[in-house]
Amino acid sequence: MLIPSKLSRPVRLDHTVVRERLLAKLSGANNFRLALVTSPAGYGKTTLVSQWAAGKNELGWYSLDEGDNQQERFASYLIAAIQQATGGHCSTSEAMAQKRQYASLTSLFAQLFIELAQWHRPLYLVIDDYHLITNPVIHDAMRFFLRHQPENFTLVVLSRNLPQLGIANLRVRDQLLEIGSQQLAFNHQEAKQFFDRRLSSPIEASESSRMCDDVAGWATALQLIALSARQNHTSAHHSARRLAGINASHLSDYLVDEVLDNVDVSTRHFLLKSAILRSMNDALIVRVTGEENGQMRLEEIERQGLFLQRMDDTGEWFSYHPLFGSFLRQRCQWELAAELPEIHRAAAESWMEQGFPSEAIHHALAAGDAQMLRDILLNHAWGLFNHSELALLEESLKALPWESLLENPRLVLLQAWLMQSQHRYSEVNTLLARAEQEIKGVMDGTLHAEFNALRAQVAINDGNPEEAERLAKLALDELPLAWFYSRIVATSVHGEVLHCKGDLSQSLSLMQQTEQMARHHDVWHYALWSLIQQSEIQFAQGFLQAAWETQERAFQLIKEQHLEQLPMHEFLVRIRAQLLWAWARLDEAEASARSGIAVLSTFQPQQQLQCLTLLVQCSLARGDLDNARSQLNRLENLLGNGRYHCDWISNADKVRVIYWQLTGDKKSAANWLRHTPKPAFANNHFLQGQWRNIARAQILLGEFEPAEIVLEELNENARSLRLMSDLNRNLLLLNQLYWQSGRKNDAQRVLLDALQLANRTGFISHFVIEGEAMAQQLRQLIQLNTLPEMEQHRAQRILREINQHHRHKFAHFDEGFVERLLNHPDVPELIRTSPLTQREWQVLGLIYSGYSNEQIAGELAVAATTIKTHIRNLYQKLGVAHRQDAVQHAQQLLKMMGYGV
C-alpha cells in the first residue's frame, strides 16, 4: 500500500515569494531530458519546483525517503507517480510494479517506455530529495531511464548533491537544464518581498539587502530571521548578524536557541515527538503526541512558520522541512531518549491501523520491540513476501531472537522461503533441521508438512528428484486442503518428478491440478510454471499442436497478469522456439530465442545457454556453418564457466555433435566421447537426448555396432514410456546409421516409420538437419510414388528445406558443372547436339530434387505455363517422355560426374 503523501505535490503557500527569474528558466524544461535542481538544504528547491508545477496536470511528483533505496519500493512509487501524471495510461507497468513481476528496474522501465510511446503530450516527473538514494542499482536504472525516456518526457530531479546520473554526458549533448545554489540564493529584491510578507513592520530595502548579503541569500536563514524576530520581538538585523556565515552543519545550536527554546514546553514536545514520522496525518499525530486534535495542531504549527509543509491538496498529510526534521529527530534522541521506544511503538500501532505494515515495521525496529515486530510479521509477513518486500523481511527476521522464531515456527518457515528465493538451498535444509531439533514440544503436523513441501522444492531445484518425490508425497499426505500454497508447491514438485521419471500421463495430470489450484488462489508464478511443464510433457508425447495451444494459454496468462519480466518467461519463449524449430519456422524460432536472451539480459550470461543453443540449431538447420561455429565458440565458453542441469548439457552437446557431423570433425567427436559420462537411465527426454548424442558421435566415428545397441534400447524405452518425439528423433538417427553402413533396406524401413510418426509430431527440421543423405533417400521414396499422401507431402517439404538451406542437387547444374559435363568424354551425344539452356538445366535439377511444377515456378519466380514449356523442351532434348525418366537421366549424369546418388 502506497503512502499518498509521497505522491503529492507540496502545496504552494500564499506567503511564499514567487521566484519569477527561476520560473522563467524552468519554463523551457520541456526542451531537456533532465532538469536538475541542486543545492544544500534550505535553499528552496522544493518550493521553487512546486511553484513551477502549479497548473501542470500531466506531471507526477515523487518525494523520496531513506526507505526508497529498496528497488521494489522505488519502482512502485515511480510508476505510481507516472500513472498520476498520465491518468492511468501505463496500466501494464503499474501491474508489474505492484506485483513485483519484473526481472530488473531497467526491464520494468523498458516496458514503461513501450506504453509511453503512445503518449504524445509533454510529460513531467519530479523526484524530490534524490540525494537520499544510495543504492547503485537504482542509479544504474535511472541512467538507463534518462537514456531511453521518450522525447516528450522531462525528468526533474531535486538533490542536495550532484546525482550519479551521467550528468556530464547530458551536459555535453545540451540535454540538461541546471539550477544550482548560486541561482537559488535569494537576491535583494526577493529578500525584500520575503520580509514584507513575513514581518509585521516593514523594513527598508537597504536593511533587507544587507541581511540578504549577511546570509548569502540562504532561504532557510531568511526564514529563521523572520521567525526569531517575531518570537523574540527583536530586530531582524540582530538575528541576521547571528546567522551571518553560518551553514547547515552549524545550524543545530542556532535552532535550539532561536526556535526550540522560544516555544512553550507543549509545542517543544509536540515538535520532538512528531519528528519521528517521515509523513504524518491527524491519526498518527493523535497517537504519537497524545494531542486530542492532531489536524488542528498541525495547522497551528504550520501557521507559526515552524518548517511544516503540506504534502497534498487536501491538507491531510504533512511533513517537516528535511533540514528541520533531521534536527528535531536528533534532539528527540537526546531529550526524549527514555520515551523514544514508546513513541515509536505508538507510531507503529497507528500505521498498522491505517494499513501500512511496512511503515509499522520501520518503527517497531526503531523501538527495538521484538514482540511487536513478531506480531506484525505473524499477521503481515506472507503478504509482504508475496509482494517481494524481501529486504525488509530479512532485516526484520534478523532482528528477532532465535527463541522467538522457535516459538513461532511459521516465521522459521518464512525465513527458509526467503533463503530458497535466493537459491541458498543448503542453508534452507540446515535452518529447518535446526528448528525441528530445537522446537520445544511436539511439532504441529501441518507445519511439518509445510516444511516438507519447501524441502521438496529445494530438492528438485538441487537436482535430487528421488528425495523431492518422497518429501512432496509426505507433505500432500499431511497438508489440510486449506493450506493451499504448500499444496500447490508439493503438487507441482510431484508432477515435475514424474516428468523426470518418464511417467508423462500422470505428470500431466498433476500439472493440470497445479494450474487449477494456482489460478484459483492467484498464485500466478506456479500457474505459469505448470503450463510450461504441461507444454513440455505434450511435446515429449509427440503432441506438438497441443503443446502449442498450451503455450498460447501461458502467453495469455503472462499478458493478463503482467509476468513478462519473470525469468520463467524465458523458459516459455525457449520451448516455443524449440517447437518452431521442429516445424522449420526458423526465422520465428530464432526471434523467439533472441527474445529469451533479452528477458535474461540482467542475469548471469550462463543463464542464456539454452537460448544460445537454439540459435546454433537455427544456423545448423540453415546450413550456415560459419555462423554456427561463431555461436558455438560462445556456447563452449559458457559451458566451461558454469554448472548446469543435465538437460542443458544434453542440448548444448547436441548442437556440438551435429556440427562435428556436418563438418566431418571426427577428432572433436572422439575426444568428447571419451570424456562424456554415460547416463544411468534413458527414461526422460533429456537423458534420451544425451544417449542420442553419444550414438551420433559413434556413427560419425564408424562405430556402428555400439551405436545400434544404444538406439535400439532408446527406442524400447521411448515406446514403453510413450516418448514419441524422442522415438521420432531416434528413428532418424537409426536411419543414418543404416544408410552409412550400407543397410539400405533397413534405412528405408525406419525412414518410413519416421515419416509416419512425423504426421503426429510435425517434425521437419529433424529431417533437414541430416542433410544430403536424407535428401537422397527422400528423392528415391518420392520416385517410387508409393508414399501415402501426407508422407509424400512431408517428404517434398523436407526436400525443399534441404534444397534451400543445404548443398542442394540443382546447384550441381550451374554453369560450371554444365561446362564440365559437356566436355566429359562419356556425355550422351544427344546432349552434345541439342544442348539444354541454363534455365532448362535448373529445371532438370529441381525435377530431380522432387519439386512439383508449381514449386519449380515458385522457386524460379516464373509462371507455371513457362515451366511447362521448359519441361516440354528438355524432355524433347533428352529423348524422354515422363518425369520419372527425366529423374533417372539426371541421376545417370550425376553418377557419371562422380556424385554419389
From Swiss-Prot:
Keywords: Activator, ATP-binding, Carbohydrate metabolism, DNA-binding, Nucleotide-binding, Transcription, Transcription regulation. GO terms for biological process: positive regulation of carbohydrate metabolic process; positive regulation of DNA-templated transcription. Residues 853-872 bind DNA. Residues 829-894 form the HTH luxR-type domain. The keyword Transcription applies. ATP binds at S39, P40, A41, G42, Y43, G44, K45, T46. SUPFAM superfamilies: C-terminal effector domain of the bipartite response regulators, P-loop containing nucleoside triphosphate hydrolases, TPR-like. CDD domains: LuxR_C_like. One of its GO terms (molecular function) is ATP binding. Activated by ATP and maltotriose, which are both required for DNA binding. InterPro entries: P-loop_NTPase (IPR027417), Sig_transdc_resp-reg_C-effctor (IPR016032), TPR-like_helical_dom_sf (IPR011990), TPR_MalT (IPR041617), Tscrpt_reg_HTH_MalT (IPR023768), Tscrpt_reg_LuxR_C (IPR000792), WH-like_DNA-bd_sf (IPR036388). Positively regulates the transcription of the maltose regulon whose gene products are responsible for uptake and catabolism of malto-oligosaccharides. Specifically binds to the promoter region of its target genes, recognizing a short DNA motif called the MalT box. Monomer in solution. Oligomerizes to an active state in the presence of the positive effectors ATP and maltotriose. Belongs to the MalT family. This is HTH-type transcriptional regulator MalT. It comes from Salmonella heidelberg (strain SL476). The gene is malT.
